[in-house]
UniProtKB/Swiss-Prot annotation:
The gene is OFUT29. GO terms for molecular function: glycosyltransferase activity. The keyword Disulfide bond does not apply. Residues 540-549 have a biased composition (Basic and acidic residues). Residues 506-549 are annotated as: Disordered. It is found in: Membrane. Pathway: Glycan metabolism. This is O-fucosyltransferase 29. It comes from Arabidopsis thaliana. Pfam families: O-FucT (PF10250).
Length: 549
């Protein structure tokens, strides 16, 4: 900046002191200069001075532009750092982060994002066969829209998986509002319900079918997939889940968000049942937590972990594992140490009580068929008597949906999304999808177990006092509570950490704005350190012999 300033001062001195510019010894004003003077020297000098001034201004703008941009960047970083440093030092408010109000979802189209290519001008029709359960298929549908955009293709409404473990024959329109899906994305991608008959009749061969590698890059689609599409005009991609790279440019990431958080809307029937369950929970309690218990037989078998059920459990889970040909043999103890085992319902209850949730907290349990049934759920019920499920709250409304696991999962999705706090016992697809959505919707409190550290605590909990255990749980859960400071670029799946779609408001710290929250929090923290509020008794020890941690 010293060099720039000196250049500027020199140019000013030249303008004010040059005898040539001031007409020799006369103090003539600049507006009185004669630009068409007969004196060639004055004309030459004026041209030189103008050029020098322009050069000086260019140099100044070059340097100051960088300085200003750097200062702005450092200012933003310091503001963000001060916010995050404060959040790390303060006690954990289990119900919400007071810094969440400074962040919001933003997925608007950029100025240079071109309109969708119309059907008649596209490179062909893209058929997508999604794979897995409801939320795994959701990732595939989201990425299918982006791939269609990359290929300049017309997307046919994706087909859902009818042959996986869940055996649900629901079609797209049975779960999602298909007309809204098509219309809301009309500016991004052209979507049709089916390939036109005239196109099918004109085809000499059936649609070309292939499966792309997982995490395929944009270049892969352009180099390997696009030539097939342009040649065959109709292309089907099968087993389409996580088939697109995590790292895309910002416009494409924002398109992912528009699909996942706005275009994929459940049908009115499903949405109505889900919101009835939410209203019935709200009628009983001002706020409630939703616990997603992924403790179904398929999850336990896939994990390769031991949950204390003895030889019977090992035989049953081993039989289920045969459905996956490529699963390796795993050491259950090593998997637990690595934090790869889903928490048991009992462990989830202990974690919640240690964090500060009291036994009068209302919980909604989102789950399918729990392995071990009521016996497995009993410890969680004892820790949280206000225990509810969709079957308990909307039994009559659910009857038409009972044969369809994906539609039932959609009800759990809605209630979990609307809850004040969302907790999961695993790192599965629903956990990731909802964690990302709740971040996008304002960093609503989302608790993910730090399974690696918690597993060691659960194994040693009988060796420590409850207060010590609770303190250690709080410590190891920092960074796993859904706070904004957990947001690190490049971390995890984009569906879980949609960083390109999160914007930040200016930060200001109001110490008096959270007095009521701190009172609630201090009461909860007091209760979490009281061993009389949890069942660490001989009854618990007996249960642990059946389901050891």
């Amino acid at each position: 900046m010293g060099v720039v300033a000196e250049v500027w001062r020199s140019s000013v001195r030249l303008l004010t002191n040059s005898p040539q510019l001031n007409g020799g010894s006369h103090k003539s004003a600049l507006w009185k200069w004669r630009f068409f003077s007969a004196q060639p020297k004055r004309t030459v000098m004026w041209t030189w001075v103008c050029g020098f001034m322009l050069f000086s201004l260019g140099v100044i703008s070059l340097f100051t532009g960088h300085v200003v941009s750097h200062l702005e960047w450092y200012s933003q970083q310091l503001s963000k750092r001060s916010l995050l440093d404060m959040s790390r030092r303060e006690p954990i408010d289990v119900w919400k982060s007071k810094y969440s109000k400074f962040f919001y979802g933003c997925s608007e189209r950029g100025r240079n994002f071109l309109p969708a290519v119309q059907e008649q001008s596209s490179n062909g029709y893209l058929l997508i066969a999604a794979s897995g359960g409801l939320n795994q298929q959701r990732t595939g549908i989201t990425d299918a829209v982006v791939v269609a955009r990359i290929l300049n293709a017309t997307l046919v409404v994706p087909e859902l998986d009818h042959h996986s473990y869940w055996k649900d024959d629901s079609d797209f329109s049975d779960i999602f509002d298909v007309n809204w899906f098509i219309s809301s994305l009309a500016k991004d991608v052209t979507i049709v319900k089916r390939v036109p008959d005239r196109v099918m009749r004109a085809m000499e061969k059936p649609p070309y079918t292939t499966r792309v590698p997982r995490k395929s890059t944009l270049e892969y689609y352009l180099d390997q997939v696009l030539p097939i599409l342009t040649r065959r005009h109709v292309l089907q991609l099968t087993k389409f889940d996580y088939r697109l790279a995590n790292d895309l440019d910002e416009d494409m990431q924002k398109l992912r968000c528009r699909v996942n958080y706005h275009a994929l809307r459940f049908t009115k029937r499903i949405q109505s049942v889900g919101m009835k369950v939410v209203k019935r929970m709200r009628k009983m309690a001002k706020r409630f937590i939703a616990v997603h218990l992924r403790f179904e037989p398929d999850m336990l078998a896939f994990s390769g972990c031991d949950f204390g059920g003895g030889e019977k459990e090992r035989a049953e889970l081993a039989e289920i594992r045969k459905r996956w040909d490529t699963l390796p043999d795993l050491d259950p103890l090593e998997e637990r140490k690595r934090g790869k085992c889903p928490l048991t319902p009992h462990e989830v209850g202990l974690m919640l009580r240690a964090l500060g949730f009291t036994n009068d907290t209302y919980i909604y349990v989102a789950s399918g068929e729990i392995y071990g049934g009521e016996k497995t759920l009993k410890p969680l019920r004892e820790l949280f008597p206000n225990f509810y499920t969709k079957e308990m709250l909307a039994n009559d409304e659910l009857k038409p949906l009972l044969p369809y696991s994906s539609r039932l999962a959609a009800i759990d999705y809605i209630v979990s999304d609307e809850s004040d706090v969302f907790i999961t016992n695993n790192n599965g697809n629903m956990a990731k999808i909802l964690a990302g959505r709740r971040r996008y919707m304002g960093h609503k409190r989302t608790i993910r177990p730090n399974a690696k550290k918690l597993s060691a605590l659960f194994m040693d909990r009988e060796k420590m006092e409850w207060q010590t255990f609770a303190k250690k749980v709080k410590s190891c859960q920092r960074g796993f509570m859904g706070d904004p400071d957990e947001f690190k670029p490049g971390r995890g799946e984009f569906h879980e950490y949609p960083q390109s779609c999160i914007c930040q408001r200016p930060f200001s710290y109001d110490k008096t704005s959270t007095d009521d929250e701190e009172e609630d929090m201090s009461e909860e923290n007091h209760n979490s350190t009281s061993p009389g509020h949890v069942h660490l008794s001989s009854a618990d020890n007996e249960r642990d012999e059946v389901f050891p941690d």
